[in-house]
A protein has these predicted regions:
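Non-catalytic C-terminal interaction segments of nucleic acid-processing enzymes
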Residues: 2-8, 90, 121-155
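Residue-level detector of flexible, active-site-proximal loop/helix-junction positions
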Residues: 54, 85, 137-139
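Amphipathic coiled-coil/heptad-repeat helices and related helical stalk/stem segments
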Residues: 32, 64, 87-91
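Acidic-basic catalytic patches of nuclease active cores, encompassing PD-(D/E)XK
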Residues: 3-62, 71
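Catalytic cores of nucleic-acid endonucleases
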Residues: 76-133
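Active-site beta-strand-loop-beta-strand hairpin of nuclease catalytic cores
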Residues: 61-78, 97
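Intrinsically disordered, low-complexity N-terminal regions enriched in serine/proline/glycine
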Residues: 17, 42-45, 68, 130, ...
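Residue-level detector of intrinsically disordered, flexible termini
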Residues: 62, 102-104, 152
């Protein structure tokens, strides 16, 4: 059941998220991704850096590499880290394209609210369980399914 955002699997990722917010955004991109990778490994995940993704024949998806993919059994997490204030659109596209169980988009120097607004404009976000995190603010929020269900529940 990969890619279905299984809520009962939160126990596998919540402790990791609380450690991830302590990563240092002042380091270079590769050094911060290395910190993130070590955190996943401490929690028993197997990791792959610069995980390749390929463009589909119809050209609807993008080719590139995802900063980090962590796996524990059949549970898969995709992580994209952007050093800037806002998470790039292509980062959202890439992590959603591989249909992970959990996607984590991290902005090194941004504010959580502006990154949440940006993520909510990306309709494909509902394809997996998505967390947005900012290292400067030391905060993370779940976007889907919890946040979208709450925000669409009001008339």
């Amino acid at each position: 059941m990969e890619g279905q955002g299984m809520p009962n699997k939160d126990y596998k990722i919540k402790p990791v998220l609380y450690k991830l917010i302590k990563a240092n955004p002042r380091l270079k991109h590769d050094e911060t991704v290395s910190q993130i990778e070590q955190i996943f490994r401490r929690y028993g995940f197997y990791t792959t850096r610069e995980y390749p993704i390929y463009k589909l024949k119809d050209g609807s998806e993008r080719a590139g590499r995802i900063d980090l993919v962590a796996r524990k059994g059949k549970f898969r997490v995709a992580v994209e880290y952007d050093h800037h204030k806002l998470i790039k659109w292509k980062s959202f596209q890439k992590i959603i394209q591989i249909k992970p169980d959990v996607a984590i988009a991290i902005a090194g120097n941004g504010e959580i609210e502006s990154n949440m607004e940006r993520a909510l404009k990306f309709k494909e976000i509902m394809m997996c369980r998505m967390y947005v995190m900012t290292l400067r603010d030391k905060k993370f929020k779940i976007i889907f399914p919890k946040y979208i269900k709450q925000s669409t529940a009001t008339p």
